[in-house]
Curated annotation (Swiss-Prot):
Protein name: D-threonine aldolase
SMART domains the record matches: D-ser_dehydrat
Summary of pH dependence: Optimum pH is 8.0-9.0. Stable between pH 7.0 and 8.5.
Function according to Swiss-Prot or TrEMBL: Catalyzes the reversible cleavage of D-threonine or D-allothreonine into glycine and acetaldehyde. Can also cleave D-beta-phenylserine, D-beta-hydroxy-alpha-aminovaleric acid, D-beta-3,4-dihydroxyphenylserine and D-beta-3,4-methylenedioxyphenylserine into glycine and the corresponding aldehyde compounds. Inactive towards D-serine, beta-hydroxyaspartate and O-phospho-DL-threonine.
Keywords: Lyase, Pyridoxal phosphate
Stored PANTHER family: D-SERINE DEHYDRATASE (PTHR28004:SF2), ZGC:162816-RELATED (PTHR28004)
InterPro entries for this protein: Ala_racemase_N (IPR001608), D-amino_acid_metab_enzyme (IPR051466), D-ser_dehydrat-like_dom (IPR026956), D-ser_dehydrat-like_sf (IPR042208), PLP-binding_barrel (IPR029066)
A biological process from GO: D-serine catabolic process
Keyword Repeat: no
GO molecular function: aldehyde-lyase activity; D-serine ammonia-lyase activity; D-threonine aldolase activity
């Protein structure tokens, strides 16, 4: 991943295979393979146990190498949130991709049609006008696409919340050229971060009841509803066991982050931190304060500042563009100048989008660098 920016001067990669973790240039995004692989196995086993397909969400990582490993363990396909985001995954040979979002605009619809010609693509709709646009785009591209009617199961974002409209959209999708009605998108994003397990369980039950009622309405009207897709890392335990969902769209489970870490995880499903931002102590201006070289351009903070892994006496207190201010708590030892620390991002999805590559390590030794090739693909 070296890049020549001036003749004869190249930006070197952050690490080489065989390098110890302490030699990785910082700031860098690092994946620890042992907990990562354990997380993949745990979620796949949970889905298999409940006879639910796993369709991991690639918006979490934007990295085809990760998606390929999820598929190798048994995932049915993947989700992407934007049409452009799907491009690198199709290029990597992934053939079953659900765009878990509405697609609006001529350029994006044309791209959707191109992708649907070379891969099995599905997309969400929640209004008749957009459904007609998708149909026209598929006809122009000479393609077919599965459409799922998105229903609002409690988040209050996109999605239909009216029986008559759900039925009308499903009927319209059956009749229009270029599209096939495939089922329902029923995702509740807010519940993923409800802190107590009991609260998540109750809201998931409510969401499942809403999704089931729409599916029953369709079936009673003679319309098959083969797919009900949704769920996430925080709700997977309950969604899989509900008997309603046919697919789970969890993504962050592979990595975990500070926000998910704040949830109560005392049930049968739990995951480990596998993703870190590596940072170096660049300054020690006071006995109780050190400065790191990783700030907002290395890890996002909309869910709070990152945590410092394995260092309970160090607290990341302020985040700037390229600096992180760390308080050394009373009684704790300040790290040395040049010391390398592991940060746990508070939100993995946008943190991945800040990096070009992922340094992959096992037992503290670099194995590879994986390209985050869908970084910035947000159209």
């Amino acid at each position: 991943m070296s890049q020549e920016v001036i003749r004869g001067i190249a930006l070197p990669p952050p690490a080489q295979p065989g390098d110890p973790l302490a030699r990785v240039d910082t700031p860098s995004l690092v994946l620890d393979l042992a907990p990562f692989e354990a997380n993949l196995r745990a979620m796949q086993a949970w889905a298999d146990r409940h006879d639910v397909a796993l369709r991991p969400h690639a918006k979490a990582h934007k990295c085809p190498e990760i998606a390929l490993r999820q598929l190798a363990l048994g995932a049915r396909g993947i989700c992407c949130q934007k049409v452009s985001e799907a491009l690198p995954f199709v290029a990597a040979g992934i053939q079953d991709i659900h765009i878990s979002n509405e697609v609006v605009g001529p350029a994006k619809l044309a791209l959707l049609g191109q992708l649907a010609r070379v891969a099995k693509i599905s997309v969400c709709v929640d209004n008749a006008h957009n459904l007609s646009q998708v149909s026209q785009a598929m006809v122009q591209a000479g393609a077919q696409i599965d459409v799922l009617v998105e229903v609002d199961v409690g988040q209050g974002r996109c999605g239909v919340s009216d029986d008559a409209l759900v039925l009308a959209l499903a009927q319209q999708a059956r009749d229009l050229p270029g599209v096939n009605f495939a089922g329902l998108q029923a995702y509740h994003g807010s519940v993923q971060h409800y802190r107590t397990r009991e609260e998540r369980a109750e809201v998931c039950r409510q969401a499942a009841r809403i999704a089931a009622s729409y599916a029953q309405l369709l079936r009673e009207s003679g319309i098959a509803c083969d797919t009900i897709t949704g769920g996430g890392t925080g709700s997977a335990e309950f969604d899989a066991a509900s008997g309603v969902y046919t697919e789970l769209q969890a993504g962050s489970y592979a990595f975990m982050d500070g926000d998910y870490g704040a949830n109560e995880w005392d049930g049968p499903l739990a995951f480990e931190n596998s993703l870190f931002v590596l940072a170096t102590v660049m300054s020690k201006p006071a006995p109780d304060r050190v400065i790191l070289d990783a700030g907002l351009k290395s890890t996002t903070a909309e869910c709070g500042p990152p945590a410092i892994f394995g260092e309970p006496g160090l607290t990341y207190t302020a985040i700037n563009d390229e600096h992180g201010v760390v308080r050394v708590e009373p009684g704790a030892q300040a790290p040395d100048l040049g010391a390398v620390l592991r940060l746990v991002p508070s939100h993995v999805d946008p943190t991945f989008n800040l990096h070009d590559g992922l340094v992959v390590v096992r037992d503290g030794v670099v194995e590879d660098i994986w390209e985050i090739s869908a970084r910035g693909f947000s159209r």
